[in-house]
Amino acid sequence: MFSSTYLLAIIALAVSSVFAAGPTAVPLGTAGNYAILASAGVSTVPQSVITGAVGLSPAAATFLTGFSLTMSSTGTFSTSTQVTGQLTAADYGTPTPSILTTAIGDMGTAYVNAATRSGPNFLEIYTGALGGKILPPGLYKWTSPVGASADFTIIGTSTDTWIFQIAGTLGLAAGKKIILAGGAQAKNIVWVVAGAVSIEAGAKFEGVILAKTAVTLKTGSSLNGRILSQTAVALQKATVVQK
């Protein structure tokens, strides 16, 4: 009987030989400079660990909650023991507000770019139940909620791309993970989600989330990629690493 590692190697070879490299990458613009970017608020239940910058606009710094912020001497950014990088908000000193306005605009543009791509390679595949599945490069589209109650694999090379268009909600069950195989990289995986996103306790998520609404990472969960939300991001002792 073949091992799972051997089978994944065979699938990786098939992907590189048969499937296209995936859709054209989504241009994030200056929104890509942030591990977390949101419009309405970013909250944490300490201790969370964020590697990268956190930006908030048009909401003010009072909506950066749970971080115990320390303002810089310039008044243009703050720091937190939970964040490796700067935190900025719309009411900070010049030029921060204009930088954030541009980033928020770029986030909206990226969302539209990803959400309106046509001609999906995979339409309503697995009816949105991704647990146990293997996903090659391509453009995926669902008009319903998408979730995983078991681990699943995203497989492809380091230059391949994925766009997952989701009209409903997105969820990853507690303790489950997305496995990257064949060299696939989180920075090349885009989840464009119209509904709420919930990464349950202890789950491990991979990719860039472009969210129309709220994103929640529950206790002990982690994300490699970025969270770009048009409303709010809530972390509960979670880890976010910008990729």
Swiss-Prot record:
Keywords: Antifreeze protein, Secreted, Signal, Stress response
GO CC list: extracellular region
pH-dependent activity: Optimum pH is 5.8.
Principal localisation: secreted
The keyword Transferase is assigned to this record: no
Site residues by UniProt (Ice-binding): 40, 232
Pfam families referenced in this protein's UniProt entry, alphabetically: Ice_binding
Lineage: superkingdom: Eukaryota
Induction: By low temperatures, 0 degrees Celsius.
InterPro entries for the chain: Ice-bd_prot
Family listed: Belongs to the ice-binding protein family.
Function noted in UniProt: Binds to the surface of ice crystals. Inhibits growth of the ice crystals. Has antifreeze activity for survival under snow cover. Has high thermal hysteresis (TH) activity, which is the ability to lower the freezing point of an aqueous solution below its melting point, and thus the freezing of the cell fluid can be prevented protecting the organism from ice damage. The TH activity of this protein is 2.0 degrees Celsius at 0.11 mM.
UniProt-recorded name of the protein: Ice-binding protein K1-A
Organism: Typhula ishikariensis
Gene that encodes the chain: K1-A
